[in-house]
Amino acid sequence: MILKSQVEWALHCCAILAGLPEGRYLSTKALAELHGLPKEYLSKALQSLSQASLVDTTLGPSGGYRLARPSSEINFLDIVEAVEGKARSFTCTNIRDNNPCRPAGYCDSKPCAVARVMWEADEAWRNTLRRVRLSDLVGTLSEEVPAELWQSTFEWVLKRAG
């Protein structure tokens, strides 16, 4: 399964937005600059988050994005589905029906074994993403990123937050 690069961008941006003080916003420009991303493409990912009600937006000189609810109430699956959509990662086209050896009128009563395995794997993947909260990511990053870099990053962010 290959996810759009915007999924990675959205996850990282949400982790940064989780650190904003109440009532502050961060612009697309600042988020793009922080992550070295093209602003126009990042904007599309952020709009997807907004349409999914994961972030709030405001216009104007101090406008931008902030989380719409606490990071403990947003999971990875919420973010992935906001960018990628909610469709299953595997679509069965039932090619077994094309088998020339199949008797006329033969009908299978259950999905094929391939589809069942793929759907089970998809559900396991979604359950894993569902269990990981944005607040978990922030906690992991705060432990793994050197303290000086973590602090300087948020100082940089706060200077640009509206």
Residue ranges: model-predicted function:
Residues 92-162:
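C-terminal regulatory/oligomerization modules of transcriptional regulators
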Residues 1-14:
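Short alpha-helical segments that sit at the start of domains
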Residues 28, 46:
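Helix-turn-helix DNA-binding elements, focusing on the entry/boundary residues of the two helices
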Residues 40:
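Key DNA-contact positions within bacterial/archaeal DNA-binding proteins
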Residues 53-62, 66-68:
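Beta-hairpin "wing" of winged helix-turn-helix
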